[in-house]
């Protein structure tokens, strides 16, 4: 019976990561002129504004490709932020939201093994899927 719980938790982790990856690929990305424009866009979207309205009001563009135009470079909110920071933030967020929830549902010795697999899956997801030039809209 114990291996059954172990397999279930790994399957749940993989399914959640696949769903997140599919959503990331479908959505457009926003590129902003500078940090002030990025903050404006994020605030507008958080308040419920649509992507086109917020992009127009905040000097940003919605793109469908993986890279921002050179005159719209801003992904990072802080000038000193870079790819390692983004990857680490992604990995921590994935681990906290996916793996920790699995830990709350299933307890036991095999869960420690599953948590390791889940953490590795998050690291692979964030390292392979990190795109620095743009951010999800």
Swiss-Prot record:
InterPro entries reported in the protein's UniProt record: Thionin, Thionin-like_sf
UniProtKB keywords: Disulfide bond, Plant defense, Secreted, Signal, Toxin
Listed GO MF terms: toxin activity
GO biological process: defense response
Annotated localization: Secreted
PROSITE patterns reported for this sequence: THIONIN
Signal peptide (residue range): 1-28
Propeptide span(s): 75-137
Coiled-coil parts of chain: none
GO cellular component, one term: extracellular region
Name of a matching Pfam family: Thionin
S-S bonds: 31-68, 32-60, 40-58, 44-54
Family membership: Belongs to the plant thionin (TC 1.C.44) family. 4 C-C subfamily.
PANTHER family: THIONIN-2.1-RELATED
Protein task: Thionins are small plant proteins which are toxic to animal cells. They seem to exert their toxic effect at the level of the cell membrane. Their precise function is not known.
Protein name: Leaf-specific thionin BTH6
Organism in which the protein naturally occurs: Hordeum vulgare
């Amino acid at each position: 019976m114990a291996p059954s719980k172990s397999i279930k938790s790994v399957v749940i982790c993989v399914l959640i990561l696949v769903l997140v990856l599919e959503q990331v690929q479908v959505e457009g990305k926003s590129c902003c002129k500078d940090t002030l424009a990025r903050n404006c866009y994020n605030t507008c979207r958080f308040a419920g504004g649509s992507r086109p309205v917020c992009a127009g009001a905040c000097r940003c563009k919605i793109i469908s490709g993986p890279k921002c135009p050179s005159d719209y470079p801003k992904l990072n909110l802080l000038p000193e932020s870079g790819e390692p920071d983004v990857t680490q933030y992604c990995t921590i967020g994935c681990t906290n939201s996916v793996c920790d929830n699995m830990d709350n549902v299933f307890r036991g010795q095999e869960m420690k093994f599953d948590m390791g697999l889940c953490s590795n899956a998050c690291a692979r997801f964030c390292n392979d899927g990190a795109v620095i030039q743009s951010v999800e809209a």
